[in-house]
Amino acid sequence: MQTKTVTVKLDKHCYDIIIGPGLVAQAVWQIKHSLHKKDLHQTRFALVTDSNVASLHLDTLQAELTKNKIHTVPIIVEAGEQSKSFLTLQIVIDRILAARLERGDCVIAFGGGVIGDLGGFAASIIRRGMNFIQMPTTLLAQIDSSVGGKTGINSRYGKNLIGAFYQPQCVIADTCFLDTLPLREFRAGYAEIVKYGLISQPDFFEWLEKNWQKIFSNGPTRTEAIVRSCQFKADIVARDEHETGERALLNLGHTFGHMLETATAYDSNRLIHGEAVAIGMVLAHQFSAQLNLINPTLIQRVEAHLKAVGLPTQLKDIPGKLPEAETLMTLIAQDKKVSQNNLTFILTRGLGQSFIAKTVSPEAVLAFLEQKLAEIR
């Protein structure tokens, strides 16, 4: 299967997202090309990964690098959202500094979204910025979190509240890694693909409705979905790198979704990010309908598609008890899009007609949350 390349074109930095099977075998060439180096013998690499990816794929990557006489420093953290913390960040930083890696050396984030965010944030602050390469191993990371330069960790006050924009030198998305991805994780990544259609690509959403089963089977349709998703996000990031405008549209479903992740204490047994986004997108459409922005039939269509692939779509699908509406409101108030204490949501006027809604009434949001919680109690 042919390798595809999507280029992220920024004002001060351009980089490639390379997509296709068997890219680990080409990793050395891709890394040399992206770092503009003839050889890598004098460059050391911190391989930041998690316990799950390490057990499945780390030996393969290390063998490829070692074969080319490249020095590596593997750094393995616990798998899961809870590793996006100050404690784990400190561990990663200490390992890199103890190995005396320099600014001209490189951090490779080898894993899913958590590892990309964690490794990228470490690279951004060590020696005021090291070389950084993303090697995403999950669908969600390949089509979303590895693209665009967002890095960071969570706080007890909310998700992704501590971080930096720090673009990688390249993204190497080997689709073979998806063959070992648990179905639950694949579904979670698919939610972010659906998001791209709902934002402003109704034709893409309709294509997903017809082709989702092929995407869940390894083949050219899966690669096409990944490429189209990366291209869509790359185009938005190129126009708005630091999220001062339209890039906020990429947060469709995330205001409610991040609220739910924080409310469940980032417990992956209850909820993972893509699942939270799926529920969040349904909530965003329901809230839009409550504000008389859309016909309720669109909610049914969106929810039906997410359910068809096995994603949760309602609060009742989350195991365990959720906090009261007032507590959930305090979590929403910490959302990154809040400006001058005004709530900002990504809402919709129709299929593929999402927009940034500023100064949303807190009273309307609170009443909506109370209604949704009442439905499950």
Curated annotation (Swiss-Prot):
Which amino acids does the record list as binding Zn(2+)? 192, 254, 273
Q: What class of enzyme is it?
A: lyase
Q: Does the keyword Zinc apply?
A: yes
EC id: 4.2.3.4
Per the record, the pathway is: Metabolic intermediate biosynthesis; chorismate biosynthesis; chorismate from D-erythrose 4-phosphate and phosphoenolpyruvate: step 2/7
Keyword annotations: Amino-acid biosynthesis, Aromatic amino acid biosynthesis, Cobalt, Cytoplasm, Lyase, Metal-binding, NAD, Nucleotide-binding, Zinc
InterPro entries according to UniProt: Dehydroquinate_synthase, DHQ_synth_AroB, DHQ_synth_fam, DHQS/DOIS_N, DHQS_C
Q: Which cystines does this chain contain?
A: none
Among the entry's GO cellular component annotations, what is one?
Answer: cytoplasm
Reaction(s) catalysed (UniProt annotation): 7-phospho-2-dehydro-3-deoxy-D-arabino-heptonate = 3-dehydroquinate + phosphate
Its Gene Ontology molecular function terms? 3-dehydroquinate synthase activity; metal ion binding; nucleotide binding
Q: Which Gene3D superfamilies match?
A: 3.40.50.1970, Dehydroquinate synthase-like - alpha domain
Organism superkingdom: Bacteria
Task: Kindly list any coiled-coil regions of this protein.
Answer: none
Gene Ontology terms describing biological process: amino acid biosynthetic process; aromatic amino acid family biosynthetic process; chorismate biosynthetic process
Q: Where does NAD(+) bind?
A: 113-117, 137-138, 150, 159, 177-180
User: Matching NCBIfam families, A to Z?
Assistant: aroB (TIGR01357)
Tell me its family: Belongs to the sugar phosphate cyclases superfamily. Dehydroquinate synthase family.
UniProt function note: Catalyzes the conversion of 3-deoxy-D-arabino-heptulosonate 7-phosphate (DAHP) to dehydroquinate (DHQ).
**Protein name (Swiss-Prot/TrEMBL):** 3-dehydroquinate synthase
Protein's organism: Bartonella quintana (strain Toulouse) (Rochalimaea quintana)
Gene for this protein?
aroB
